[in-house]
A protein has these predicted regions:
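Conserved acidic
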Residues: 108
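N-terminal, polar/charged subdomain of small-to-medium soluble alpha/beta proteins
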Residues: 1-95, 111-158
Length: 158
């Protein structure tokens, strides 16, 4: 399972001319997370990804005595906008056309993606999503910019 994690000031997802999820503009901002589910990923992979996403220390904070530090989405109650993105599993190492063979089929990927989202919500985070498998317009105002790639190998890829 792969995720592209971007710290944002605000973000939204539009499907069929309707906003289906958003992170409102705020001082804290939030995380826009694109998730690709690989063949071989399981609910255990999804739980590991949700743990990493919730505790990734990429927000600015300060200690009790005022020293700067990095804090997680859990620490600052930052909202997340989580989007399924099978194209993250694309292989471009051969030829000019990406291969999607590493991406899980939709029927396999959707419940694993949903497990990751539910695990984030179970940790107390506010999580909006797009519509699985739909064409989506994703808008964001990046903060920093700050973007990282998180890769949780399935047992098949470890």
């Amino acid at each position: 399972m792969k995720a592209v994690v971007t710290r944002v000031r605000s973000a939204s997802i539009v499907v069929y001319d309707s906003v289906v999820g958003s992170i409102p503009d705020s001082d804290v901002g939030g995380l826009l997370v694109l998730i690709g589910v690989a063949t071989g990923d399981t609910s255990a992979t999804a739980r590991a990804m949700s743990e990493k996403l919730a505790r990734l220390r990429i927000f600015e904070g300060s200690t009790a005595d005022g020293r700067p530090t990095e804090v997680s989405a859990l620490d600052v109650n930052a909202p997340m906008l989580v989007v399924s993105q099978f194209t993250l599993m694309g292989d471009t190492s051969h030829g000019r056309r990406p291969s999607w063979s590493a991406a899980a089929k939709p029927a396999e990927a959707e419940p694993i993606f949903n497990t990751c989202v539910e695990e984030l919500r179970d940790r107390g985070l506010s999580v909006d999503t797009g519509v699985f498998g739909a064409y989506m317009a994703v808008e964001s105002v990046n903060d920093g910019p700050f973007t990282v790639l998180v890769d949780i190998p399935s047992e098949d890829r470890s």
